Amino acid sequence: WIPACTGMTEFDGMPDLKLSMFAIAALFRIHFICYLPKGRLKTVRLVLAKFLLKSNALSLSDDIAMQAHTLVWFRRNLRIRDNAALSAAVKRGLPVAGVWVAQGSSEIPNPRQDWFHYQAAAALHRSLAARGVALYVVNRVEELPALATRLNVQTVIADEAYTSSEIGQDNRIWRILDEQGVAFERVNDRAIFAKAEIMGSHGAPYTDFPHYKEAWLALFRQRFGGQDAGGGCVEIFQTASVEMPSFPAWNGQQDMVSAQRGGEDEADKQWRQFEENIGFYPIMKDFPARKGTSRLSAYLSAGCISPRVLATEAAGQGADAWLDNLIRRDFYQQLAYHRARIEPESAAVSATFSDDLTECWRQGKTGFPLIDAAMRSLKSSGWLHPALRSLTAEFLCGILHQPSEHGIVWFAEQQTDFDPALNVGNWQTAARNACRHSIDIIQTARRLDPDGTFVRRHIPELAHLPVNLVHTPWLASSEIDAHGYPLPVVAP
């Protein structure tokens, strides 16, 4: 083994060593990993593979496994079209493999989102397999370095992380991979513009949305100019791969109910349906009972569809009102990365926590029909209309005077489209708004649900009430039965 350490690249003059794979692996680990510089490690691996092949100690499948690979770590970019990480891997010219970590990085359990991401990853597995690319599934992120060693990976490429927990995880994985001589690269695949592409005049991140939006639009026009983002499917058709592993069966909660199904094709179908009526979005977006929004948030959260593609296609149709949602999404992503200081809630908003009040809010039993209908809808389907998200958040902070942190956690547990950066950003905005102005909950309810359709859909106890009482059932005469629907927990 000494010639290999000193630079020898052929084993022609060496005796035919009859070592088992286990013995060779042990010898390799003990004598090479401990003493070789990182730059030598991959050379020795390839030299070892050559020797094993010449001595017939390695099968054809093992030979493929010993080839150098580029590994794409799919996280919140579970798609092929306009996938920057996959494109970067293909450009390297080495065989490409993928990996998906079944246990996500979120510290808050969310079985409904886990199920959605599982469906999306299964669809990605099929799409990659059709192109000759293997997608491996590991249970925990700590298993990724071992897979990289097994596949003789030169570089791991992943979508850029934004939150502190994800960045911390990336740093831990990077250190392990670095010790193995494996590079770890990250590319912008989650937002339209990378986290530091749009900065203020003094190099500081924008903390107010109007100024950020102005800068975002200027850069968008400069870079895309209304043209397509170039988001076609990656041209990758590999004729050989390490293997084609099967996709594991779902081992999570069995009774999951989701309003949508995960996957790139499902995302594209949802976008095309909305695209047909995108011109009506400014008129219909504030009515929860109508299908006036895109319902793409879960697909964007999982990365089943590219925000770059959506932005260029929406801009090409003059859909500025809807494009505003994608800009705000970028805004909250970069805020999460920069950990920009957002105005804290006032002492009046963050009053003493009441578990009873917060639990009534969670379960849709506050006695305010539209709030309760919204919270019941969220719990049953995992999705909530955007207008109702801000209303229920402002209700918790401004009317019940409860800390936003409890709402942040509850939404994180319930939403199929949960995104940590957007969740925190939206809640902090709602808490700030609740501090600055009072909410007329009744007038707002009548504006958003004028005929009570949404309330009746989710609160059957009130389905029999007329329009003038459906949002104020406490005003009904004693002869009208509310079927156990509670009185308001605070004075209307």
Predicted regions: what is each one?
Residues 50, 56, 182, 203-352, ...:
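Glycine/tryptophan-enriched, flexible segments
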Residues 333, 362-402:
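C-terminal substrate/ligand-recognition segments
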